[in-house]
Amino acid sequence: MEIILGIVMFTVIVLVLALMILFAKSKLVSEGDITIKVNGEKELTMPAGGKLLGALANEGIFIPSACGGGGSCGQCRVVVKSGGGDILPTELSHISKREAREGCRLSCQVNVKTDMDIEVPEEVFGVKKWECTVISNDNKATFIKELKLAIPEGEEVPFRAGGYIQIEAPPHTVAYKDFDIPKEYHEDWDKYNLWQYVSKVDEPILRAYSMASYPEEKGIIMLNVRIATPPPRVPDAPPGQMSSYIWSLKPGDKVTISGPFGEFFAKDTDAEMVFIGGGAGMAPMRSHIFDQLKRLNSKRKITFWYGARSKREMFYVEDFDQLAAEFPNFTWHVALSDPLPEDNWDGYTGFIHNVVYENHLKNHEAPEDCEFYMCGPPIMNQSVIKMLKDLGVEDENILLDDFGG
């Protein structure tokens, strides 16, 4: 009898657990089709499942996401009027309590499980996809390549200077030993044994890059891409997925981009413009400065201050020298933080924020009236912002591209 009772109790427990699992599945696992109403007009029907960012992209609505949907950039904002569940802790570092009450969400964090009613920025309806062809992919510095893409014939990417595109990469495996690196840069690659790395990616990825080209350079998109190698203190960490993929591209390869996106745009004023950059932060600096001078024929006073380690890390030198010769309202300066003996450098040395202060802003009659545009490594951005705050520059005159470096 006890054996029979035990079997019955065991069976009951199994049935209860099975029912609990089925109930949980009905609540947690997405099934069937759902409808998403966009901006009170467009209705999208799609299978439930996945994140809202990807679901919208599949329907041709591309929400900007500099981090590729990782939840770290905070740019893929939409307003969820109904559906979507509760806001997640990962979103609250980017969304204020007031914004959360108004329905603001990060689309990369919203699960597509039920019918939803959402609002997206109107400008995203102007975003498109293009399959581009690699024209060239050349080293401009030890760890920076210039990727030049040809837009399909008859097409145009209607971007503004300072804007960015998103680039897609399929699943891939990339070995650093196969990279085409000019010999002049081998010293550092050998020193840090960078040839050892392999980047293996098992699913499609998406990342954002600021454009180095400006709107009048028709038919092409230019990017400056820094290779994201593991930090020396954590050599076993995986290398950057997208930068590794981009560095492997060769002329003739096909690449899918979407855009344009952006908010790092120049103000339409007569104020002096001070551009401060470093590393791959060169990209939006070049785009802005060329646009102001070559397309707009701006008469504003424009200075450009760029920080690099050594002469080997300087690029677009001839381009900016030519601009300075052609436009009397433009000057540019480079500061090397660690010049090599063979550089025979007699220019500015040190960190760029100190050089800008000592040689331009220290005795400037009204630095608070200038507009400052910057893009570079995080520590450079932080140092420049502190220096500007100490000078009394208001936030509205400090414009930062914080993912282009």
Swiss-Prot record:
SUPFAM superfamilies from the UniProt entry: 2Fe-2S ferredoxin-like, Ferredoxin reductase-like, C-terminal NADP-linked domain, Riboflavin synthase domain-like
Organism: Neisseria meningitidis serogroup B (strain ATCC BAA-335 / MC58)
EC identifiers of the protein: 7.2.1.1
GO molecular function list: 2 iron, 2 sulfur cluster binding; electron transfer activity; metal ion binding; oxidoreductase activity, acting on NAD(P)H, quinone or similar compound as acceptor
Alphabetized UniProt keyword annotations: 2Fe-2S, Cell inner membrane, Cell membrane, FAD, Flavoprotein, Ion transport, Iron, Iron-sulfur, Membrane, Metal-binding, NAD, Sodium, Sodium transport, Translocase, Transmembrane, Transmembrane helix, Transport, Ubiquinone
PANTHER family: NA(+)-TRANSLOCATING NADH-QUINONE REDUCTASE SUBUNIT, NAD(P)H-FLAVIN REDUCTASE
Protein family: Belongs to the NqrF family.
Protein name, UniProt field: Na(+)-translocating NADH-quinone reductase subunit F
Cofactor(s) annotated in UniProt: [2Fe-2S] cluster; FAD
Cellular localisation: Cell inner membrane
Enzyme class: translocase
High-level lineage: Bacteria, Pseudomonadati, Pseudomonadota, Betaproteobacteria, Neisseriales
Transmembrane regions: 3-23
Known role: NQR complex catalyzes the reduction of ubiquinone-1 to ubiquinol by two successive reactions, coupled with the transport of Na(+) ions from the cytoplasm to the periplasm. The first step is catalyzed by NqrF, which accepts electrons from NADH and reduces ubiquinone-1 to ubisemiquinone by a one-electron transfer pathway.
Location of the region described as Catalytic in the Swiss-Prot/TrEMBL record: 270-387
One Pfam family matching this protein: NAD_binding_1
